[in-house]
Curated annotation (Swiss-Prot):
Record lineage: Bacteria, Pseudomonadati, Pseudomonadota, Alphaproteobacteria, Rhodobacterales
Main localization (coarse): cytoplasm
Any Pfam family hit: Leu_Phe_trans
Keyword Acyltransferase listed: yes
Keywords attached to this entry: Acyltransferase, Cytoplasm, Transferase
Organism per entry: Roseobacter denitrificans (strain ATCC 33942 / OCh 114) (Erythrobacter sp. (strain OCh 114))
Protein EC: 2.3.2.6
Protein name per the record: Leucyl/phenylalanyl-tRNA--protein transferase
Enzyme superclass (EC): transferase
Role of this protein: Functions in the N-end rule pathway of protein degradation where it conjugates Leu, Phe and, less efficiently, Met from aminoacyl-tRNAs to the N-termini of proteins containing an N-terminal arginine or lysine.
GO molecular function, one term: leucyl-tRNA--protein transferase activity
Length: 210
């Protein structure tokens, strides 16, 4: 039986998420890590070099302008867990306003971005990509600012990578994650309501919070 978007959202509500072994594998399996990566929304680490680049950049930040393009960018690597079924499901969730992308543009060219799923005040980050230096870091900084502004309480990164840890992400136990997840899912939040801010404005806001 084919997986439906509603079943996928029920899975997120219980703390599990889907992956495929590789892009050509038609099957999907469920993942429930013993240790979960999260990004504390008030703990984003912005290095001096990233701050300088964001203050000087000509990149534009856009929301949901090319969701499918962001998913394609995330899958455009030698080894990816994003197969055709995952593309299908998340494009449906996007059409239902349950999955969103934050995009980094250079003129008319999409050069980076991140996409994920929203449920209550929880944001489940799925994947990100970069075609310019630090474009994914800029996307994450702008995403953290947007989630804070929209009333989100949980930014789930699934796993803790070295890249995410350098930006302030941490790892918590499954039990700790479940508690935070249930609290976040019970709260309202909005991904689309906050105003769109430039990288320069985001630097100022994050600096004021640190």
């Amino acid at each position: 039986m084919r997986l439906t978007p509603d079943v996928l959202m029920q899975a997120y509500a219980t703390g599990i998420f889907p992956m495929a072994e590789h892009r050509d594998d038609p099957d999907i399996f469920w993942v429930d890590p013993l240790r979960r990566g999260i990004m504390p929304l008030r703990g984003f680490h912005m290095s001096r070099s990233l701050r300088r680049q964001m203050l000087r950049t000509a990149f534009d930040i856009r929301i949901d302008q090319d969701f499918a393009g962001v998913v394609d960018g995330c899958a455009d690597r030698a080894d990816t867990w994003i197969n055709d079924e995952i593309r299908r499901l998340y494009n449906i969730l996007h059409a239902q306003d349950r999955a969103h992308s934050l995009e980094v543009w250079e003129g008319d060219t999409l050069v980076g971005g991140v996409y994920g799923v929203t449920l209550g005040a929880a944001f489940f980050g799925e994947s990100m990509f970069s075609r310019r230096s630090n474009a994914s870091k800029i996307a994450l900084a702008c995403l953290v600012d947007r989630l804070l502004d929209g009333g989100f309480a949980l930014f789930d990164t699934q796993f803790l990578t070295e890249h995410l840890a350098s930006l302030g992400a941490i790892e918590i136990s499954r039990a700790q994650y479940q508690k935070r997840l249930q609290e976040a899912c019970a709260r309202p939040a909005s991904f689309l309501n906050p105003p769109l801010r430039s990288p320069q404005e985001v630097v100022q806001r994050i600096t004021q919070m640190s």
